[in-house]
């Protein structure tokens, strides 16, 4: 088992504190209410990485096809946490999270199970998550479909706090190779699953303002989830239809260069909290509610 020092994460914006209280009330009476927990623990090493401030640009990846595929290289090991502002402007977040005693099947199950009720989504990050309905929700519970058939080409409509900003987002999941990953490299890297996506603001769903790469791979003690977030405008995003409008749309939405750098920091904190918290509850939650023997 990987040796890690975990520390409580205790600072949440006032809107997030109020959202926690609302979520706490809403989850009462649900069979999974015991998994709604106020304590969020994160790796101390990840906190210390984020506290160092923005990363040097030389250590970042862009959303280019070339940089995406660097994530699949045999010698690629992601840093645990970090954020930066790329030219564009574009918010950048990187992370690598360890899920002890978890399997790829557990994480796939989570993405099929949690969007079916808003209260399930709040288990993931009780202070930040509001709801995450799925456009084609019937596909999530269709046992004749594979995980990939259920998720890819489907859209989650997430409402969540990132810092003190309530964001309404459409997360358009795609086959990773449609996003730029090389099929041969993806196969050779033995990735166990991807929940990668394009993301748009809810009021302009045809304008991708973000690319998210989430790749997970099992190890003897559990699994690792390696993630990259790019939010904003960048020449490499032009391969996605509508992305040429991203800079103007974000500026109109109050996300200029200064705000995007703040968003990068807040997304780094959000990612650290939500996925480490999910890792702490997923094995028991899956055992109780998946129906798996």
UniProtKB/Swiss-Prot annotation:
It catalyses: 2,4-diacetylphloroglucinol + H2O = 2-acetylphloroglucinol + acetate. Keywords: Hydrolase, Metal-binding, Zinc. Disruption phenotype: Deletion of the gene slows down but does not eliminate degradation of DAPG. Deletion does not alter the ability of the bacterium to colonise plants or promote plant growth. It is an enzyme of class 3 (hydrolase). GO terms for molecular function: hydrolase activity; metal ion binding. Induction: Expression is positively regulated by GacS and negatively regulated by RsmE. Its cofactor is Zn(2+). Pfam families: DAPG_hydrolase (PF18089). Coiled coil: none annotated. The keyword ATP-binding does not apply. Zn(2+) binds at residues 129, 160, 270, 274. Its EC number is 3.7.1.24. Hydrolase that specifically degrades the potent antimicrobial compound 2,4-diacetylphloroglucinol (DAPG) to equimolar amounts of mildly toxic monoacetylphloroglucinol (MAPG) and acetate. Belongs to the DAPG/phloretin hydrolase family. This is 2,4-diacetylphloroglucinol hydrolase. It comes from Pseudomonas fluorescens.
């Amino acid at each position: 088992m990987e040796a890690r020092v975990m520390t409580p994460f205790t600072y949440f914006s006032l809107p997030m504190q109020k959202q926690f209280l609302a979520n706490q009330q809403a989850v009462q009476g649900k069979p999974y209410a015991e998994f709604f927990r106020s304590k969020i623990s994160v790796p101390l090493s990840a906190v210390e990485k984020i506290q160092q401030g923005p990363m040097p640009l030389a250590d970042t990846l862009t959303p280019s096809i070339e940089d995406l595929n660097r994530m699949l290289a045999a010698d690629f090991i992601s840093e645990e946490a970090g954020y930066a502002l790329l030219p564009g402007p574009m918010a950048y977040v990187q992370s690598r999270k360890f899920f002890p005693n978890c399997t790829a099947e557990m994480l796939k199950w989570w993405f099929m199970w949690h969007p079916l009720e808003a209260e399930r989504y709040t288990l993931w990050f009780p202070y930040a998550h509001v709801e995450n309905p799925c456009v084609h929700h019937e596909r999530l519970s269709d046992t004749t479909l594979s995980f990939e058939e259920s998720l890819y080409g489907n859209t989650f409509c997430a409402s969540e706090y990132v810092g003190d900003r309530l964001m309404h987002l459409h997360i358009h999941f795609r086959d990773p190779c449609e996003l730029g990953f090389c099929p041969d490299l993806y196969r050779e890297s033995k990735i166990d699953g991807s929940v990668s996506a394009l993301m748009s603001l809810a009021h302009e769903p045809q304008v991708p303002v973000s690319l998210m790469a989430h790749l997970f791979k099992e190890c003897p003690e559990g699994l690792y989830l390696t993630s990259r977030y790019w939010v904003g405008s960048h020449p490499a995003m032009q391969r996605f239809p509508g992305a040429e409008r991203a800079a103007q749309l974000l500026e109109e939405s109050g996300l200029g260069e200064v705000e995007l750098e703040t968003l990068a920091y807040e997304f780094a904190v959000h990612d650290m909290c939500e996925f480490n918290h999910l890792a702490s509850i997923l094995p028991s939650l899956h055992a109780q509610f998946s129906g798996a023997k």
